[in-house]
Amino acid sequence: MNDKFHFIMYKLSNYNIIISNKGYSYWFNSLTRKFFRITEALGRKLEKLLDDINNIKNTYPSFFSILENGGFIIPTEIDELSIIRQKNQEAIQSKNYYLMVLPTLNCNFKCWYCIQNHIPSIMSENVVTNIKKHIDYLLERNEIELLHLDWFGGEPFMYFDKIIKPLTLYAKEKCENAGVQFFCGATTNGYFLTQDVVGQLDALKFLQFQITLDGQREEHDKVKYQKGCPSAFNHVLRNINNMLHASDSIILFLRINYEHNKITNDIVSQINEFITPDVRNRIKITPRKVWQETVDKDSFHNILELMDLFSANGYMVERWHPISSFIPCYANKKNYVAINFNGAVVKCTACDDLYSKEFPGILKDNGTIEWRDDFDKKYQCKSFENERCLNCKRLPVCMGLCPKDHILGHTYCKETMLDYRFEDSLINYIDHEYHGNSDAGGCDSSRGG
């Protein structure tokens, strides 16, 4: 057929989410992450037009263009679920290698909510050597495009000079010689980020850190305390400020753990005492309730007020945390492993596998990993392949249960575990995107909030 006589037929996307709230109509497509906001009255009128979408192009061409560009309406031949499955498989098979290393399970603090047993431990020279061999093995096979070395624990910076520095330098040099991208990250309590340490982070290609505060000063210092340190809160924030001044490349994810009846807005001014305005735009605030706290979705508005205050003081704020990689967890990836201090290899550090007598995997002396009972392949599961998930408009920004829970046979909807309503969080995100952009009609959520 001649192209000029070929008419494209359209259908509605299965992943359109339309929310009316406080005078606005919020339109969001969870597959494309595109959105727009209009008045509620106009939104009701436009929703009625969707009953005859193939006539919208002629009668309301500008509206049609917005819907088409945002993926709200799509050609009838497009199979969105096939797209999601393909993106999921691509994410699982990604050539970016995420190598987490735990030099120790010990820690200088003993936080009451911590899921880990802080046993005295340190990675041996033999395990360090085997990790180097593992890196050599990865690069020699020429199957990875990036190596992300991430430090975890315990408290990894207890052994900066002995383990982190030499192993990072080795990995960095090997990747440079192989033409493979490389960078480092770390989850730490921040206590050992001394002036000497932070002065070396750029050379080691550290780009991101996650550090946790346990509420405002008085609460944090009840949870984290150490002999000879009057305030761990003050000490860690000084270290953070020094680190961000020593390196222009580092982004800090500052997680704020909270209990509903203990978090107050005082924490903002307390943090401001130590963090100078010129580096606040490289700190992303991520509030999280401690996992033992009961879910209370009505508490979101209290946290929202706190986030607004942080934003007004120059910090980045995590307004919404959708899955953007088409997997529910990084452990879902084929190329993700966590190597414990003793050479045991796991896929999840948030469960008891680190302490199991039968390790899920073991790092061999030749640098390869031997998995027990195809343990690694079980983590490449498709936990969204069930009727509830496949029929959910939020599938592309959720992607189902965490692999561990899926393997254990759990079937709950993980949204029930969130401390906020999906709609409240999405509205807050879109509102702030519009507040910060004069032309928000073309916004998409990939820019972050």
Please report, for each region that a protein language model flagged, where it lies by residue.
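A C-terminal junction/extension of Radical SAM enzymes
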Residues: 2-10, 279-284, 288-355, 397, ...
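N-terminal [4Fe-4S]-dependent radical SAM core
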Residues: 11-37, 60-100
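Short amphipathic alpha-helical recognition elements used for nucleic-acid or partner binding
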Residues: 37-53
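Short, charged low-complexity linear segments at domain edges
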Residues: 75-95, 310, 314-318, 323, ...
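Conserved glycine-rich "GG(E/T)P / GGGxP" loop and the immediately following alpha-helix
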Residues: 100, 104, 117-285
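The canonical Cys-X-X-Cys-His
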Residues: 107, 111-114
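Detector for the c-type heme attachment site
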Residues: 114-119, 393-397
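Flexible mid-to-C-terminal extensions adjoining Fe-S/redox cofactors in radical SAM and related proteins
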Residues: 355-449
